[in-house]
Amino acid sequence: MAGQLREYRRRIRSVQSTKKITRAMELIAASRIAKARARVAAARPYAEEITRVIEAVAAQTTIDHPLTTERPGAARAAVVVITSDRGLAGGYSSNALRRTGELIELLHSEGKETDLHVVGRKGTGYYRFRGRAMSGEYTGFSEQPSYADAKSVADALIAAFIATSENGGVDEIHVVHTEYVSAITQTPVARRLLPMVLTETDEPPRGGPLPQYEFEPSAEGVLDALLPRYVESRLYAALLESAASESAARQRAMKSATDNAEDLIKRYTRQANRARQDAITQEISEIVGGANALASGT
Protein backbone atom coordinates (compact mmCIF):
# COMPACT_ATOMS: atom_id res chain seq x y z
CA MET A 1 0.00 0.00 0.00
CA ALA A 2 2.77 2.43 0.94
CA GLY A 3 4.54 1.77 -2.37
CA GLN A 4 1.34 2.42 -4.31
CA LEU A 5 0.79 5.68 -2.45
CA ARG A 6 4.34 6.84 -3.24
CA GLU A 7 3.77 6.04 -6.93
CA TYR A 8 0.59 8.13 -7.06
CA ARG A 9 2.31 11.06 -5.37
CA ARG A 10 5.21 10.80 -7.84
CA ARG A 11 2.76 10.91 -10.73
CA ILE A 12 0.98 13.93 -9.25
CA ARG A 13 4.28 15.84 -8.99
CA SER A 14 5.16 14.90 -12.58
CA VAL A 15 1.81 16.08 -13.97
CA GLN A 16 1.97 19.29 -11.91
CA SER A 17 5.37 20.04 -13.44
CA THR A 18 4.00 19.46 -16.95
CA LYS A 19 0.97 21.62 -16.17
CA LYS A 20 3.22 24.56 -15.26
CA ILE A 21 4.94 24.30 -18.65
CA THR A 22 1.71 24.05 -20.67
CA ARG A 23 0.15 26.91 -18.72
CA ALA A 24 3.18 29.13 -19.37
CA MET A 25 3.10 28.27 -23.09
CA GLU A 26 -0.63 29.01 -23.17
CA LEU A 27 -0.08 32.49 -21.70
CA ILE A 28 2.83 33.24 -24.06
CA ALA A 29 0.78 32.20 -27.10
CA ALA A 30 -2.18 34.27 -25.92
CA SER A 31 0.02 37.37 -25.57
CA ARG A 32 1.37 36.88 -29.11
CA ILE A 33 -2.08 36.63 -30.70
CA ALA A 34 -2.92 40.30 -30.10
CA LYS A 35 0.47 41.45 -31.42
CA ALA A 36 0.20 39.24 -34.50
CA ARG A 37 -3.33 40.45 -35.27
CA ALA A 38 -2.18 44.06 -34.97
CA ARG A 39 0.63 43.38 -37.47
CA VAL A 40 -1.86 41.75 -39.85
CA ALA A 41 -4.14 44.79 -39.64
CA ALA A 42 -1.20 47.13 -40.26
CA ALA A 43 0.03 45.22 -43.33
CA ARG A 44 -3.34 44.58 -44.97
CA PRO A 45 -4.01 48.13 -46.34
CA TYR A 46 -0.73 48.19 -48.29
CA ALA A 47 -1.32 44.74 -49.80
CA GLU A 48 -4.88 45.64 -50.78
CA GLU A 49 -3.89 49.01 -52.26
CA ILE A 50 -1.07 47.64 -54.38
CA THR A 51 -3.53 45.06 -55.73
CA ARG A 52 -5.94 47.88 -56.63
CA VAL A 53 -3.17 49.76 -58.42
CA ILE A 54 -2.32 46.70 -60.52
CA GLU A 55 -6.01 46.18 -61.33
CA ALA A 56 -6.24 49.83 -62.38
CA VAL A 57 -3.17 49.56 -64.61
CA ALA A 58 -4.46 46.34 -66.16
CA ALA A 59 -7.86 47.93 -66.83
CA GLN A 60 -6.31 50.89 -68.66
CA THR A 61 -3.89 49.04 -70.93
CA THR A 62 -4.03 46.23 -73.44
CA ILE A 63 -0.47 44.98 -72.98
CA ASP A 64 0.19 41.37 -72.08
CA HIS A 65 2.24 41.34 -68.89
CA PRO A 66 3.29 38.23 -66.91
CA LEU A 67 1.81 39.79 -63.78
CA THR A 68 -1.74 39.68 -65.15
CA THR A 69 -1.69 37.43 -68.22
CA GLU A 70 -2.35 33.70 -68.25
CA ARG A 71 0.40 31.74 -69.97
CA PRO A 72 -0.88 29.38 -72.65
CA GLY A 73 -0.05 25.76 -71.95
CA ALA A 74 1.13 26.42 -68.39
CA ALA A 75 3.11 23.32 -67.41
CA ARG A 76 4.78 24.11 -64.09
CA ALA A 77 3.58 25.75 -60.88
CA ALA A 78 5.39 26.82 -57.72
CA VAL A 79 3.55 26.02 -54.48
CA VAL A 80 4.46 27.85 -51.28
CA VAL A 81 3.21 26.26 -48.05
CA ILE A 82 3.51 28.03 -44.69
CA THR A 83 3.86 25.79 -41.61
CA SER A 84 5.31 26.25 -38.11
CA ASP A 85 8.87 25.91 -36.87
CA ARG A 86 7.76 24.40 -33.56
CA GLY A 87 5.20 21.79 -32.59
CA LEU A 88 2.55 21.80 -29.85
CA ALA A 89 0.15 23.78 -32.05
CA GLY A 90 -2.58 21.19 -32.55
CA GLY A 91 -3.40 20.51 -36.18
CA TYR A 92 -2.08 23.84 -37.47
CA SER A 93 0.73 22.49 -39.67
CA SER A 94 -0.95 19.19 -40.59
CA ASN A 95 -4.04 21.04 -41.85
CA ALA A 96 -1.91 23.31 -44.04
CA LEU A 97 0.00 20.31 -45.40
CA ARG A 98 -3.25 18.48 -46.12
CA ARG A 99 -4.56 21.51 -48.05
CA THR A 100 -1.27 21.62 -49.97
CA GLY A 101 -1.67 17.97 -50.91
CA GLU A 102 -5.14 18.71 -52.30
CA LEU A 103 -3.78 21.64 -54.33
CA ILE A 104 -0.91 19.56 -55.73
CA GLU A 105 -3.35 16.82 -56.76
CA LEU A 106 -5.48 19.42 -58.55
CA LEU A 107 -2.48 20.88 -60.38
CA HIS A 108 -1.28 17.42 -61.39
CA SER A 109 -4.75 16.62 -62.74
CA GLU A 110 -4.38 19.72 -64.94
CA GLY A 111 -1.10 18.36 -66.29
CA LYS A 112 1.14 20.72 -64.31
CA GLU A 113 4.31 19.80 -62.46
CA THR A 114 4.89 21.39 -59.07
CA ASP A 115 7.87 22.98 -57.31
CA LEU A 116 7.60 23.11 -53.53
CA HIS A 117 8.75 26.08 -51.47
CA VAL A 118 8.26 25.29 -47.78
CA VAL A 119 8.22 27.70 -44.84
CA GLY A 120 8.66 26.19 -41.36
CA ARG A 121 10.54 23.18 -39.97
CA LYS A 122 7.37 21.12 -39.64
CA GLY A 123 6.77 21.35 -43.37
CA THR A 124 10.39 20.73 -44.39
CA GLY A 125 10.58 17.73 -42.06
CA TYR A 126 7.32 16.35 -43.44
CA TYR A 127 8.46 16.45 -47.07
CA ARG A 128 12.03 15.37 -46.33
CA PHE A 129 10.74 12.28 -44.51
CA ARG A 130 8.66 11.39 -47.59
CA GLY A 131 11.55 11.98 -49.98
CA ARG A 132 9.84 14.92 -51.70
CA ALA A 133 12.22 17.37 -53.38
CA MET A 134 11.90 21.01 -52.33
CA SER A 135 13.00 23.99 -54.39
CA GLY A 136 13.17 26.24 -51.34
CA GLU A 137 13.32 25.79 -47.55
CA TYR A 138 12.76 28.75 -45.21
CA THR A 139 12.88 28.27 -41.44
CA GLY A 140 13.36 30.17 -38.20
CA PHE A 141 10.74 32.92 -38.50
CA SER A 142 7.27 31.33 -38.58
CA GLU A 143 6.14 32.91 -35.28
CA GLN A 144 7.47 36.43 -35.89
CA PRO A 145 8.10 36.98 -39.62
CA SER A 146 9.65 40.20 -40.88
CA TYR A 147 9.32 41.90 -44.26
CA ALA A 148 12.90 40.80 -45.00
CA ASP A 149 11.82 37.18 -44.49
CA ALA A 150 8.95 37.65 -46.96
CA LYS A 151 11.36 39.28 -49.42
CA SER A 152 13.77 36.34 -49.27
CA VAL A 153 10.95 33.96 -50.22
CA ALA A 154 9.58 36.37 -52.85
CA ASP A 155 12.98 36.81 -54.52
CA ALA A 156 13.26 33.06 -55.14
CA LEU A 157 9.70 32.88 -56.46
CA ILE A 158 10.08 35.86 -58.79
CA ALA A 159 13.35 34.49 -60.15
CA ALA A 160 11.56 31.22 -60.96
CA PHE A 161 8.57 33.06 -62.45
CA ILE A 162 10.60 35.17 -64.88
CA ALA A 163 12.96 32.31 -65.82
CA THR A 164 12.35 30.26 -68.95
CA SER A 165 10.99 26.75 -68.72
CA GLU A 166 14.35 25.42 -69.96
CA ASN A 167 15.99 27.00 -66.90
CA GLY A 168 13.47 25.60 -64.42
CA GLY A 169 11.01 28.48 -64.57
CA VAL A 170 7.40 28.25 -63.41
CA ASP A 171 4.21 29.53 -65.04
CA GLU A 172 2.17 30.00 -61.86
CA ILE A 173 2.73 30.71 -58.17
CA HIS A 174 0.32 29.44 -55.52
CA VAL A 175 0.49 30.01 -51.78
CA VAL A 176 -1.08 27.91 -49.02
CA HIS A 177 -1.40 29.60 -45.65
CA THR A 178 -3.71 29.56 -42.64
CA GLU A 179 -6.29 32.32 -42.53
CA TYR A 180 -7.05 33.73 -39.08
CA VAL A 181 -10.84 33.82 -38.67
CA SER A 182 -11.10 33.97 -34.88
CA ALA A 183 -9.35 32.68 -31.77
CA ILE A 184 -11.30 29.45 -32.24
CA THR A 185 -11.24 29.09 -36.04
CA GLN A 186 -8.23 29.12 -38.37
CA THR A 187 -8.73 27.89 -41.92
CA PRO A 188 -6.03 26.73 -44.38
CA VAL A 189 -6.55 28.38 -47.77
CA ALA A 190 -4.86 28.11 -51.18
CA ARG A 191 -4.64 31.14 -53.48
CA ARG A 192 -2.94 31.80 -56.78
CA LEU A 193 -0.47 34.61 -56.44
CA LEU A 194 0.71 34.87 -60.06
CA PRO A 195 -0.62 35.50 -62.60
CA MET A 196 -3.13 37.65 -60.75
CA VAL A 197 -6.73 36.55 -61.01
CA LEU A 198 -8.58 39.53 -62.54
CA THR A 199 -12.33 39.01 -62.75
CA GLU A 200 -14.56 41.03 -65.02
CA THR A 201 -17.73 42.23 -63.31
CA ASP A 202 -20.34 44.96 -63.65
CA GLU A 203 -20.23 45.65 -59.92
CA PRO A 204 -18.19 48.66 -58.72
CA PRO A 205 -14.73 47.70 -57.41
CA ARG A 206 -14.31 47.32 -53.67
CA GLY A 207 -12.95 50.55 -52.22
CA GLY A 208 -14.53 52.74 -54.89
CA PRO A 209 -13.82 53.31 -58.59
CA LEU A 210 -10.35 52.41 -59.80
CA PRO A 211 -8.10 55.49 -60.11
CA GLN A 212 -7.04 56.84 -63.50
CA TYR A 213 -3.29 56.92 -64.09
CA GLU A 214 -0.82 58.32 -66.57
CA PHE A 215 2.11 55.96 -66.94
CA GLU A 216 5.74 57.08 -66.97
CA PRO A 217 7.67 55.74 -68.75
CA SER A 218 5.06 53.10 -69.72
CA ALA A 219 2.38 50.84 -68.28
CA GLU A 220 4.66 47.86 -68.80
CA GLY A 221 7.43 49.61 -66.86
CA VAL A 222 5.02 50.29 -63.99
CA LEU A 223 3.96 46.64 -63.88
CA ASP A 224 7.60 45.53 -63.96
CA ALA A 225 8.27 47.71 -60.92
CA LEU A 226 5.13 46.51 -59.12
CA LEU A 227 5.77 42.78 -59.67
CA PRO A 228 8.25 42.28 -56.78
CA ARG A 229 6.34 44.67 -54.48
CA TYR A 230 3.11 42.78 -55.09
CA VAL A 231 4.60 39.35 -54.39
CA GLU A 232 6.46 40.59 -51.30
CA SER A 233 3.42 42.32 -49.80
CA ARG A 234 1.11 39.36 -50.43
CA LEU A 235 3.59 36.88 -48.97
CA TYR A 236 4.20 39.13 -45.97
CA ALA A 237 0.45 39.34 -45.31
CA ALA A 238 0.18 35.54 -45.60
CA LEU A 239 3.12 35.03 -43.21
CA LEU A 240 1.63 37.42 -40.65
CA GLU A 241 -1.80 35.82 -40.82
CA SER A 242 -0.25 32.38 -40.48
CA ALA A 243 1.73 33.56 -37.44
CA ALA A 244 -1.49 34.76 -35.78
CA SER A 245 -3.15 31.44 -36.61
CA GLU A 246 -0.18 29.50 -35.23
CA SER A 247 -0.31 31.38 -31.92
CA ALA A 248 -4.08 30.87 -31.66
CA ALA A 249 -3.74 27.15 -32.41
CA ARG A 250 -0.92 26.77 -29.86
CA GLN A 251 -2.86 28.69 -27.20
CA ARG A 252 -5.86 26.44 -27.72
CA ALA A 253 -3.75 23.27 -27.71
CA MET A 254 -1.92 24.29 -24.53
CA LYS A 255 -5.19 25.20 -22.79
CA SER A 256 -6.52 21.75 -23.63
CA ALA A 257 -3.30 20.18 -22.31
CA THR A 258 -3.54 22.24 -19.10
CA ASP A 259 -7.17 21.21 -18.58
CA ASN A 260 -6.27 17.56 -19.15
CA ALA A 261 -3.42 17.87 -16.64
CA GLU A 262 -5.82 19.26 -14.04
CA ASP A 263 -8.21 16.35 -14.61
CA LEU A 264 -5.33 13.89 -14.31
CA ILE A 265 -4.13 15.49 -11.06
CA LYS A 266 -7.64 15.21 -9.59
CA ARG A 267 -7.86 11.54 -10.60
CA TYR A 268 -4.44 10.69 -9.16
CA THR A 269 -5.29 12.62 -5.98
CA ARG A 270 -8.47 10.57 -5.52
CA GLN A 271 -6.53 7.35 -6.11
CA ALA A 272 -3.81 8.46 -3.67
CA ASN A 273 -6.43 9.29 -1.01
CA ARG A 274 -8.07 5.91 -1.55
CA ALA A 275 -4.71 4.15 -1.25
CA ARG A 276 -3.97 6.11 1.93
CA GLN A 277 -7.36 5.19 3.40
CA ASP A 278 -6.78 1.54 2.52
CA ALA A 279 -3.36 1.68 4.20
CA ILE A 280 -4.85 3.24 7.35
CA THR A 281 -7.67 0.69 7.38
CA GLN A 282 -5.16 -2.13 7.05
CA GLU A 283 -3.04 -0.73 9.89
CA ILE A 284 -6.10 -0.41 12.13
CA SER A 285 -7.13 -3.96 11.25
CA GLU A 286 -3.65 -5.22 12.12
CA ILE A 287 -3.66 -3.33 15.43
CA VAL A 288 -7.14 -4.60 16.32
CA GLY A 289 -6.18 -8.11 15.28
CA GLY A 290 -3.05 -7.96 17.42
CA ALA A 291 -4.99 -6.61 20.40
CA ASN A 292 -7.57 -9.39 20.05
CA ALA A 293 -4.81 -11.97 19.86
CA LEU A 294 -3.23 -10.61 23.05
CA ALA A 295 -6.61 -10.51 24.78
CA SER A 296 -7.42 -14.09 23.83
CA GLY A 297 -3.96 -15.20 24.95
CA THR A 298 -4.47 -13.82 28.42
Curated annotation (Swiss-Prot):
Subcellular location: Cell membrane
Homology family: Belongs to the ATPase gamma chain family.
Name of the molecule in the record: ATP synthase gamma chain
Keyword Manganese tagged: no
Membrane protein topology class: Peripheral membrane protein
Subcellular location, principal: membrane
Biological process (GO), any one: proton motive force-driven plasma membrane ATP synthesis
Gene Ontology cellular component terms for the protein in this record: plasma membrane; proton-transporting ATP synthase complex
Function: Produces ATP from ADP in the presence of a proton gradient across the membrane. The gamma chain is believed to be important in regulating ATPase activity and the flow of protons through the CF(0) complex.
A Pfam family annotated for this UniProt entry: ATP-synt
UniProt keyword annotations, A-Z: ATP synthesis, Cell membrane, CF(1), Hydrogen ion transport, Ion transport, Membrane, Transport
Molecular function in Gene Ontology: ATP binding; proton-transporting ATP synthase activity, rotational mechanism
NCBIfam families in UniProt: ATPsyn_F1gamma (TIGR01146), PRK05621.1-2 (NF004145)
Assembly mode: F-type ATPases have 2 components, CF(1) - the catalytic core - and CF(0) - the membrane proton channel. CF(1) has five subunits: alpha(3), beta(3), gamma(1), delta(1), epsilon(1). CF(0) has three main subunits: a, b and c.
InterPro entries: ATP_synth_F1_ATPase_gsu, ATP_synth_F1_gsu, ATP_synth_F1_gsu_CS
Organism of provenance: Frankia casuarinae (strain DSM 45818 / CECT 9043 / HFP020203 / CcI3)
